[in-house]
Design a protein with these regions (language model features):
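Flexible, surface-exposed loop regions and adjacent strand-edge segments
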Residues: 48-54, 88-94, 133-138, 175-181, ...
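Beta-barrel outer-membrane channel/assembly domains of diderm bacteria
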Residues: 16-116, 145-152, 298, 308-315, ...
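Outer membrane beta-barrel transmembrane domains
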Residues: 90-92, 200-203, 227-234, 251, ...
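Residues on the solvent-exposed faces and adjacent turns
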Residues: 120
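A glycine-rich, basic-preceded beta-loop-alpha segment at the flavin cofactor/substrate interface
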Residues: 123
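Outer-membrane beta-barrel and related beta-rich outer-membrane complex signature
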Residues: 85-87, 130, 170-174, 276-278, ...
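Signature for the C-terminal beta-barrel architecture of outer-membrane proteins
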Residues: 19-32, 39, 46-53, 68-70, ...
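Sec-dependent N-terminal signal peptides
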Residues: 3-13
Length: 348
């Protein structure tokens, strides 16, 4: 299987002569700086987290002129696959100062609507969230084919990924690239914009011998409704030991209450969905965890670059994991400022 995948991707690269030239050599899609206060306790009432944390997430891309070739990387704080945050030392935990290139990959455009990528990459979520799938901080080392286009019966986006998921405590991508020779994960995902207000995706995943199907829908509702954004998703473990989970997220983002973006979500992800023996083969979003949970969120956009958000969530069953979790987050999006600085320097 592995030699076939490599040969397939390399053969596609031979058709890259018509690739569209990238307009810029160096791009900064994301440069977000965060700080948050986080509280977590367990069923017994034991406090496990009561800390002030910081985070940096930067996404960078270098385009090789006239070739369609590009390099991408996510540089981030955090020391494990399920966390992009580090402790300041204020609170219960000791300070930690970590910054790693968590992803690093090379891509090749194949005309206007296709690309292949090889390396340590982010996961593809489709129209769903990390409530029922991989934490957004998760990485995979492998190979990916991307197809994009608009057609009445064709998906707006299609990806096929073959890779390795593991090394949960190795945040440096260069310490994991040797896994390119191992395949324990495959995902085939199709996403479609059905109407101006509805987007849906469906996917098949195979991870360590576990077969899964996942579907998600995201809808924008009329401004006058009590709910303006609706997102529902479902994941089914087909074999072995079949089980399933789902999540629903509702947000009021328009009119009088829109300035605060109040939201409510419910998630139910049994521990067994991603369990391989005694281990979790995949970690979903840490703010959701496993089991039955309800959560309440808000988000206030102070300026174009600065926003504040809150979350409080409670476990509704006896599933292992945290009971209460609460956090207050401040985020500053520095990418526009860095782009202005970049333009000023290159215009001289």
């Amino acid at each position: 299987m592995k030699p076939f995948i490599v040969a397939f991707l390399l053969s596609l690269a031979c058709f890259a002569q018509d690739a569209k030239q990238a307009p810029k050599i160096f791009e900064i899609p994301t440069a977000d700086v965060y700080t948050r206060y986080r509280y977590i306790d367990t069923n017994a009432g034991t406090v496990t987290a009561d800390d002030l944390q910081y985070r940096f997430t930067g996404r960078f891309r270098v385009n090789v002129p006239k070739t369609g070739t590009y390099f991408g990387s996510r540089v981030e704080t955090g020391s494990s696959i399920g966390s992009s945050w580090s402790n300041t030392g204020i609170g219960r935990s000791k300070s930690e100062w970590t910054l790693n290139a968590k992803t690093f990959f090379i891509g090749q455009q194949l005309g206007k609507q296709a690309a292949i990528e090889v390396g340590a990459m982010d996961m593809e979520q489709g129209a769903g969230t990390e409530a029922t799938y991989a934490d957004v901080d998760t990485w995979t080392e492998g190979y990916r084919l991307r197809l994009n286009g608009e057609g009445k019966y064709l998906p707006s986006k299609f990806t096929a990924t073959f890779g390795f998921i593991g090394d949960f405590n190795t945040p440096n991508a260069f310490g994991r690239l040797y896994r390119l020779g191992e395949i324990n994960y495959a995902q085939v995902l199709a996403e479609k914009k059905l109407t101006k207000t509805i987007r849906a995706s469906a996917e098949y995943d195979r991870l360590r011998g576990i077969d899964l199907f996942r579907a998600a829908t995201k809808m924008s509702l009329p401004d006058s409704w009590w709910i303006n954004d609706l997102q529902v998703e479902n994941v089914v473990r087909v074999a072995p030991r079949a089980t399933s989970g789902w999540a629903l997220n509702l947000v009021k983002s328009k009119n009088r209450l829109g300035w605060l973006n109040p939201g409510i979500y419910y998630s139910h992800l049994p521990t067994g969905v991603y369990k391989d023996g005694a281990q979790q083969a995949l970690l979903n979003g840490d703010v959701y965890g496993t089991g039955k949970r309800i959560g309440f969120t808000t988000k206030y956009q102070a300026t174009k670059a600065l926003d504040f958000s809150t979350l409080i969530t409670r476990k509704l069953d006896s599933d292992p994991g945290f009971r209460w979790r609460a956090q207050i987050v401040a985020r500053y999006q520095a990418a526009p400022l860095l782009k202005q600085l970049q333009r000023a320097l290159t215009s001289r």
